[in-house]
């Protein structure tokens, strides 16, 4: 039994083209079915807060994944790194970057909507400090994780609280 990671940042086809994922949603669906049939665990990587993405759209992605036989999920915020097309686009026309409080609230909602049996492998990420343009607050990963834990406890949020599958 081993793991395979499939990138699945969004359901919106415009985002898939923008980030150059290179394949449509149906390819992801087929790969999940084939991997599961082969006895391979599927861990999905979701990037939150793509340019123009709303929280409702992010939750639709979570709901979609809940309907798939995935075993694990990695959630993280979009990072803008120096030398990338995304950095160029951001410099030309800055788009919304959430502050830590907004991200934590969104992560709380994602966790509440996530199927209880899906293993959470990641709640945040930290881009290379020398390349990270935004969001700068992600560099304090331990602080972010502590704040997420405190928020979940204070708001009485647990995985699957809002899942009605």
Q: What kind of feature is each model-predicted range?
A:
Residues 1-2, 8-13:
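Short, small-residue-biased leader/transition segments that mark boundaries at the very start
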Residues 12, 35-56, 77-82, 89-97, ...:
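Conserved strand-turn element in the central/C-terminal portion of the radical SAM core barrel
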Residues 14-18, 130-131:
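A short acidic, helix-capping loop that chelates divalent metal ions and anchors anionic groups
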Residues 17-28:
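A contiguous catalytic/ligand-binding core that recognizes phosphate-bearing ligands
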Residues 28-29, 54, 58, 103, ...:
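Aromatic/hydrophobic pocket-lining residues that form the small-molecule binding cavity
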Residues 29-37, 111:
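Surface-exposed amphipathic alpha-helices with a cationic face
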Residues 51-67:
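Catalytic cores of alpha/beta
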Residues 66, 72, 79-165:
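Auxiliary Fe-S-binding modules of radical SAM enzymes
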């Amino acid at each position: 039994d081993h793991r395979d990671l499939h990138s699945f940042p969004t359901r919106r086809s415009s985002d898939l083209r923008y980030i150059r994922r290179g394949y449509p949603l149906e390819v992801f669906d087929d790969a999940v079915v084939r991997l599961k049939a082969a006895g391979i665990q599927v861990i999905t990587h979701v990037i939150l807060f793509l340019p123009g993405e709303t929280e409702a759209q992010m939750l639709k992605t979570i709901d979609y994944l809940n309907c798939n036989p995935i075993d694990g999920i990695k959630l993280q915020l979009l990072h803008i790194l120096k030398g990338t097309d995304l950095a160029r686009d951001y410099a030309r026309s800055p788009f919304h970057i959430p502050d830590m409080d907004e991200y934590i609230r969104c992560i709380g909602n994602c966790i509440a909507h996530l199927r209880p049996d899906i293993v959470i492998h990641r709640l945040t990420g930290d881009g290379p400090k020398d390349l990270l343009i935004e969001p700068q607050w992600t560099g304090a990963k331990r602080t972010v994780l502590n704040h997420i834990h405190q928020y979940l406890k204070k708001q009485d949020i647990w995985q699957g609280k809002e899942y009605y599958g």
